[in-house]
């Protein structure tokens, strides 16, 4: 077992008001899913190094928010990198709606919002950023997301001209517009 100070602690809480939580539970049950995300016995080490973490398991239902807590170097970002398919775990598995996911599948089904958003924003305007990679006309959806994130007035602005918090809202907006079933925020 890893020393207590290197273990990853995690807590589960619902981040929505009561009525919203009920909506997400109803939506989840109506789609016949028991858990949106299941992580079982995940472990990781860099090449021949010691374990960064091991035996990490948790479940997250649709609408749940999970906070991963730990000191610097505990493996929080490494865990997110595995969950998003950027790194391959040493052991364990990640499932979405009961289906085991490969790292490649995890990359396409999740969206990672990083603390330093400058590496995630590429377009010439906020609106263009939200529509990148979309195959269909999604103007109504983009308008709704811009309104919800209080970014409507910044639609035509270059992402680099926004504050740090506004940039983070843009990256969260991208995840919402793309309907990513799982959103990770680091």
Task: Describe the predicted segments one by one.
Residues 69-71:
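The feature captures the beta-strand-to-loop junction immediately N-terminal to the Walker
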Residues 84:
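Helix-to-loop junction immediately C-terminal to a conserved catalytic motif
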Residues 92-106, 110:
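Conserved ABC transporter NBD signature motif
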Residues 139-154:
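Conserved ABC ATPase "signature" region
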Residues 158-162, 166:
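Conserved ABC ATPase signature
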Residues 172:
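Hydrophobic anchor residue at the start of the ABC signature
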Residues 183-186:
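Catalytic Walker B motif of ABC-type/P-loop ATPase nucleotide-binding domains
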């Amino acid at each position: 077992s890893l020393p207590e100070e290197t273990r990853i602690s995690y807590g589960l809480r619902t981040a929505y008001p009561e009525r919203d939580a009920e909506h997400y539970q109803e939506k989840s049950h109506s789609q016949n899913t028991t858990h949106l995300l299941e992580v079982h016995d995940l472990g990781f080490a860099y090449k021949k190094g010691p374990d960064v973490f091991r035996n990490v398991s948790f479940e997250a239902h649709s609408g749940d928010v999970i906070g991963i807590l730990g000191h610097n170097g505990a493996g929080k970002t490494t865990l997110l990198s595995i969950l998003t398919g950027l790194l391959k775990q040493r052991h364990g598995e990640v499932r979405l709606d009961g289906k085991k996911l490969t790292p490649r599948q995890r990359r396409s089904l999740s969206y990672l919002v990083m603390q330093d958003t400058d590496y995630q924003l590429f377009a010439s305007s906020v609106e263009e950023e939200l529509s990148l990679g979309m195959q269909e006309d999604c103007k109504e959806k983009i308008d709704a997301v811009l309104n919800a994130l209080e970014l409507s007035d910044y639609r035509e602005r270059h992402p680099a001209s926004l504050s740090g918090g506004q940039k983070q809202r843009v990256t969260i907006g991208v995840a919402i517009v793309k309907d990513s079933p799982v959103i990770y925020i680091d």
